[in-house]
Each structure stands twice: as C-alpha cells, then as structure tokens.
C-alpha cells in the first residue's frame, strides 16, 4: 500500500501540506461520510434504537451552536469545597489532576480521593507522582475505597463531587447516595463518548442514541433519577503532561526511530484528540454555572476533528521529522487492530456543542502547538532513547513488504 493516501476528504495527503489543513474546522457541523465495512461496525449494539435512548430528558439536542495549566484566582462567584473521586489507573486519571489544580487556582477548596493505597506502585507513575503540586496549591490528597467515602473523608462536607472513577452503577452508586445524604449540591460524572451508538452522520452530539446497556449510561440514568443537580461529561482521547496512557507517544516512538507508522484502514478516519486542560476547564465551567449545567450531558472534547493520518503528520511536524505512513487491512494481515493500534479503526468523533451553548465554554486545544510541548517532554524524560519492541508493527510491515526503518 502507498505510504500516504492519494485522496482525502478534507485535505491533501502530501506531507508538505500546511499543518492547518490537517484539522477539521468546527464549521463543518453536519456532513455525511462514506462508510466502510469497518467504519462503524464496532459500535453496533444488539439493543433496538428506541430502547437505546435514555428515558430522562436532556436540554441538549443536535443543534448548531502552554503546558502550564493554571487560571487566575477569581474573586467572582461562590467559593466551593469540591471532592474529586479519582481513578488510580488509565487515561482518565489525569482529568482529576488537572481539574484539582484549576479549581485551586480559581480559589476553590479541593480534596482528591484516589482509589487504593498511597503506597501502591501505581502512585509512582504520573499523574500521581505529581500530587505534591496539588498539596502545594492548598489541596488535600487522600486514598481509600470510594464505597466507604464517608470514612475516607472523615465526615467533611462538600458542595460539589466529581466521580472520575466508576464505570458502572455498582461502583458509583455508593458515592452518589452518600453525596445526596450528606447535602452535596452538585454531582458531576466522567462518562465516555464510547457509549454512543454508531452513526452515519458524524460527529456524535449530545442527544444521539447510546448503547442502553453500557455501564456509563446506567449511571447517567441513575443520576437523573436520583440527584437534583447533576451533569455528565463524555471524553474521548486526550493529551497532556501527566497522562499515563499513551496517545501521541505511540506516534513519537515510531517517528523518532525512523520507522514507518502503520495505520489501519484508509487513515482518513476522523477522531477527536483534546488537551486535558480543555476537559478540566469544561468541568470548572460547570462548577461555576451549576444551574446551566444541571441535568445535562456534555461531550468533553475539543471542537476540531483530526484524521488518523493527520495525527501522524502533526506528531512528525512536532518532532521536526518526516513520516512514512503505511495503511493495512488488519483482517488480511491477521492482526487485531485493537492491539496493533491505539485508536478505534473507525470514525469516532464528537463535538462539544452543549458546553458551548449552555456554559459559554471555548476550546483551547491547539494540536500543532500542544504536540510540540508534548514532544519536548517526551525527549526530556528520555523516551526517545528507550528500547522499545515493535513485534506487531514488524509483522504488519513484513506483510506489506515495507522496510522496518528508513
């Protein structure tokens, strides 16, 4: 297969194309894309489309609408005591870290409750090994089991709770029930944009059909039935210092070693990659505007799409190098695309219309510039010199008769 596709829906496939052409402008709010056998099938659900819609009402519908991540302390608005229940693994952990720092900068009080034990090996990794930044900013850090949240926080009362941990009702219910009984005024929940059903009309927007049996959906329904003031946030992929789940690093690993970058399918699949500061600023906007946020679901993403090929090119530009992209059919080669590639092999793109309409929120993600910062840190920590094995890549490249490295 050719290194770069010869045709593109929105931009030239040539590596010399302006970087600005690699990003899809938010003005393209509604468009139809040619589907392929792999475009949306992985999000199909056995439940009917009618049963997939949540029974509670949403105010939103399909309508138009630098590395340092601090904000100036503001004297406007009520200062609140916020509890963040934070996961101890995965890409979402960094959301709680950024959110805590932004809240502290805005003058709020913050306690971050991390699942598990402070002495565990997980706490030696980012963002947990940077929690001193939260403490130095005036925040508190505690560890424990969210099912026993009252005991962990020692009876302290809070105005706002964010659950950035649970993926199912069994995990989240104890926190919701405790929050309600203890007088918490606002409950925020980190859900996932992965709960949307496949669509022939991307992007996903708030109000689109979801998979009714998905754990996050069940939690959202319980919140709607139980809590007076609640809001749910559905993120996608993210980048940012302190993230412990690979995103841009996957591309950098190959680019700095002059290896071809294998991307399944055409490489034109759209996705959304946000800087985590966008996610934290959206959450902070909800804390500042609780009535506007109440009872709503927000796609917690930036406002521009990028293609999979485009992400590879942007990462190469950030590293000051060229990139060879090779496309492949996972089934024909006999590899599992989920293991060989870090993103979904399909259009997976949501837009943050509700946050713009209801909260007056604006995205600050700028992938070309953000990726330059990320590459600087990548080199600073020495990952560009780390020994890395590429067994699946080698299998793919061998099948395509492509040299492993230039």
From Swiss-Prot:
One term of GO molecular function: mRNA binding
InterPro entries per the UniProt record, alphabetical: Epimerase_deHydtase (IPR001509), NAD(P)-bd_dom_sf (IPR036291)
Compartments (UniProt record): Plastid, Chloroplast, Plastoglobule
Disrupted gene: phenotype observed: Lethal when associated with CSP41B disruption.
Phosphoserine modifications at: 266
Gene3D superfamilies: NAD(P)-binding Rossmann-like Domain
Transit peptide, from-to: 1-72
GO cellular component, one term: ribosome
Pfam families associated with the record: Epimerase
GO terms classed as biological process: chloroplast organization; circadian rhythm; plastid translation; positive regulation of DNA-templated transcription; positive regulation of translation; rRNA processing
This protein's UniProt keywords: Chloroplast, Phosphoprotein, Plastid, RNA-binding, rRNA processing, rRNA-binding, Transit peptide
PANTHER family registered for this protein in UniProt: CHLOROPLAST STEM-LOOP BINDING PROTEIN OF 41 KDA A, CHLOROPLASTIC, UDP-GLUCOSE 4-EPIMERASE
Protein family (similarity comment): Belongs to the NAD(P)-dependent epimerase/dehydratase family.
Subunit relationships: Component of a complex made of CSP41A, CSP41B, ribosomes, and the plastid-encoded RNA polymerase. Interacts with CSP41B.
Function: Binds and cleaves RNA, particularly in stem-loops. Associates with pre-ribosomal particles in chloroplasts, and participates in chloroplast ribosomal RNA metabolism, probably during the final steps of 23S rRNA maturation. May enhance transcription by the plastid-encoded polymerase and translation in plastid via the stabilization of ribosome assembly intermediates. Required for chloroplast integrity. Involved in the regulation of the circadian system.
The protein's name in its UniProt record: Chloroplast stem-loop binding protein of 41 kDa a, chloroplastic
Native organism: Arabidopsis thaliana (Mouse-ear cress)
The encoding gene: CSP41A
